Amino acid sequence: MGIQHLNKYIRNKITLYNNNNNNNKEEGSAIKTITFSELNGKKIVIDTSIYMYRFSSERCLIDSMYQMISLFKMNGIIPIFIFDGPSPVEKKELIKQRREEKQISETKYKELHYKLKDVNDYEERKEINNELDSLKKKFVRLKREDINNVKNLLTLYGVTYYEADGEADKLCAKMVTEKHAYACLSEDMDLFVYGCDKVLRYISLLNSTFVLYDLNKILECLDISFTHFKEICVISGTDYTCHYNDSLSCNSINPNNSINPNNSINPNNSINPNNSINPNNSINPN
């Protein structure tokens, strides 16, 4: 699930916090850019489908996955890839909505592509091609063959992967909160709701960098408890509340509670790595 406005809200608050405390240095910040080499020797879990969709939209799925794995290994990072299992019933409405949006984008793409044949003006052709590229990314579909090819690549490369019973993000968060991994690589902000205290976003294979979000430092900057933070996330709207139109505006949030470091991370059940986790198989995060 995604949380509307959360990233902008957090970034605005942290900028304000840093300005008020005359802290212009990124070092020690709640959000900072780090290099791959800074995670040498650390395990990270990866919400795999996010990057499969991204690389598929760029028509370089296997090449980019291979490059990602190679760069991780080169920098001493131990990756654990998590694949989605069946989607929860609660997300049925959203999945239907996304399927319809993909069909609309695909139809528009075909219409524009047909129109392009009769356009001779260079600037107009350039504009249409840019729109075609944008539309193409909106109706990317992963086939079972794509998933199997990526799993085969991971197996050949000796990389561990799991398939969750449900969505991958919950299992990713669980593995971080229970210290089976240092951080989770994902673009979904909802990992914070599950108590995942370190999230890596905006991966750049070209520059070998991530942007690290540190939940405990974020809570300190916001001056709120983890419980209050979760309430803000839920009110803001998630994939499970897509039928509601009232999402929380970034400017309307005025958290005044103080942080309680004892309840900032509250994982639920424990994972026994010797019994309940079977590499390259399915796993129940509960």
Enumerate the language-model features and the residues they cover.
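Non-catalytic, usually N-terminal nucleic-acid engagement modules in DNA/RNA processing proteins
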Residues: 1-111
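Extended two-metal-dependent nuclease catalytic cores across DNA- and RNA-processing enzymes
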Residues: 15, 20, 96-256, 283-286
